[in-house]
Amino acid sequence: MSSLTPLLLRSLTGPARRLMVPRAQVHSKPPREQLGVLDITIGLTSCFVCCLLPAGWVLSHLESYKKRE
């Protein structure tokens, strides 16, 4: 059985290797206005508060979730 596995996998992936996948030609323009330091700071802080703060709170209170009351 184990000697047939590579042959089976090769026969399944063989046709997929020959497919040509077209690549998109994506071009963008330069930004209309440059972001300042304050804008970047506000954006990174809001991402931190929205994503990492709740996860950190849950991880810090993990022991209280494990207790059965």
UniProtKB/Swiss-Prot annotation:
The record's GO CC annotations read:
mitochondrial inner membrane; mitochondrial membrane; mitochondrion; respiratory chain complex IV
Keyword hit for Transmembrane = yes
Q: Where is this motif: SIFI-degron?
A: 2-19
Give the way it sits in the membrane.
Single-pass membrane protein
What InterPro entries does the record point to? Cyt_c_oxidase_su8 (IPR003205), Cyt_c_oxidase_su8_sf (IPR036548)
Primary role: Component of the cytochrome c oxidase, the last enzyme in the mitochondrial electron transport chain which drives oxidative phosphorylation. The respiratory chain contains 3 multisubunit complexes succinate dehydrogenase (complex II, CII), ubiquinol-cytochrome c oxidoreductase (cytochrome b-c1 complex, complex III, CIII) and cytochrome c oxidase (complex IV, CIV), that cooperate to transfer electrons derived from NADH and succinate to molecular oxygen, creating an electrochemical gradient over the inner membrane that drives transmembrane transport and the ATP synthase.
Tell me the protein's name: Cytochrome c oxidase subunit 8A, mitochondrial
Classification from the root reads: Eukaryota, Metazoa, Chordata, Craniata, Vertebrata
Gene label: Cox8a
